């Protein structure tokens, strides 16, 4: 049976992905892995909102998505960012199809909290049949994090949560958060395998600080019955060499050494 990896690429890293990253994807495809990508686009949405002079505000770290903001978010996520990614994959000999969570009923959501967050959804249902069909035909689905309600209203969704939901529905072997660092570091050495308990300890000890904390928390929340392994890898270098993944692996529990 073919194995599956879902990648989550943040908006800040998409245009910085290295040649090695794309070569690694080719190697994985050649080795029989099925691949899907979920991407963000926060910085580009912010830039477009500024250009169009549309005011935006944040609440609890999440952008308040008014209807004008949602229009811009959909334009950027499903448009410029998604198609840039598809073109980059094509340049490297990888067939890809750009879709959003609205396509094929992939992500169904309800309003998270309209008062606080506006047009932002909480994912309630995932239908991964379209994603599976693309992957079975050797095509990498590139998914923008938009969703629809049961009565077909468009809602923005958090890209990390979208990636987790897609990985869960696909029963993916791995969910990889693609960042600009080699993984979780301690004293300039990468920590190869961590459990949630160890991560909480490292946050307490201030080994994990700053911008790494939300990345790690997203990885932790992605661990579930369906997704047993999450990795933090570097998209600016190589994350796969000699059939081995390089990064920090986060698992529910470490295997006992016999």
Curated annotation (Swiss-Prot):
<dbReference type="GO" id="GO:0003991">
    <property type="term" value="F:acetylglutamate kinase activity"/>
</dbReference>
<comment type="similarity">
    <text>Belongs to the acetylglutamate kinase family. ArgB subfamily.</text>
</comment>
<keyword id="KW-0963">Cytoplasm</keyword>
<keyword id="KW-0418">Kinase</keyword>
<feature type="binding site">
    <location>
        <begin position="41"/>
        <end position="42"/>
    </location>
    <ligand>
        <name>substrate</name>
    </ligand>
</feature>
<dbReference type="Pfam" id="PF00696">
    <property type="entry name" value="AA_kinase"/>
</dbReference>
<dbReference type="InterPro" id="IPR037528">
    <property type="entry name" value="ArgB"/>
</dbReference>
<dbReference type="InterPro" id="IPR004662">
    <property type="entry name" value="AcgluKinase_fam"/>
</dbReference>
<feature type="site" description="Transition state stabilizer">
    <location>
        <position position="215"/>
    </location>
</feature>
<dbReference type="GO" id="GO:0006526">
    <property type="term" value="P:L-arginine biosynthetic process"/>
</dbReference>
<dbReference type="GO" id="GO:0042450">
    <property type="term" value="P:arginine biosynthetic process via ornithine"/>
</dbReference>
<comment type="function">
    <text>Catalyzes the ATP-dependent phosphorylation of N-acetyl-L-glutamate.</text>
</comment>
<feature type="binding site">
    <location>
        <position position="156"/>
    </location>
    <ligand>
        <name>substrate</name>
    </ligand>
</feature>
<keyword id="KW-0028">Amino-acid biosynthesis</keyword>
<dbReference type="GO" id="GO:0005524">
    <property type="term" value="F:ATP binding"/>
</dbReference>
<feature type="site" description="Transition state stabilizer">
    <location>
        <position position="8"/>
    </location>
</feature>
<dbReference type="InterPro" id="IPR036393">
    <property type="entry name" value="AceGlu_kinase-like_sf"/>
</dbReference>
<comment type="pathway">
    <text>Amino-acid biosynthesis; L-arginine biosynthesis; N(2)-acetyl-L-ornithine from L-glutamate: step 2/4.</text>
</comment>
<keyword id="KW-0067">ATP-binding</keyword>
<dbReference type="GO" id="GO:0005737">
    <property type="term" value="C:cytoplasm"/>
</dbReference>
<keyword id="KW-0055">Arginine biosynthesis</keyword>
<dbReference type="InterPro" id="IPR001048">
    <property type="entry name" value="Asp/Glu/Uridylate_kinase"/>
</dbReference>
<keyword id="KW-0808">Transferase</keyword>
<protein>
    <recommendedName>
        <fullName>Acetylglutamate kinase</fullName>
        <ecNumber>2.7.2.8</ecNumber>
    </recommendedName>
</protein>
<dbReference type="InterPro" id="IPR001057">
    <property type="entry name" value="Glu/AcGlu_kinase"/>
</dbReference>
<keyword id="KW-0547">Nucleotide-binding</keyword>
<feature type="binding site">
    <location>
        <position position="63"/>
    </location>
    <ligand>
        <name>substrate</name>
    </ligand>
</feature>
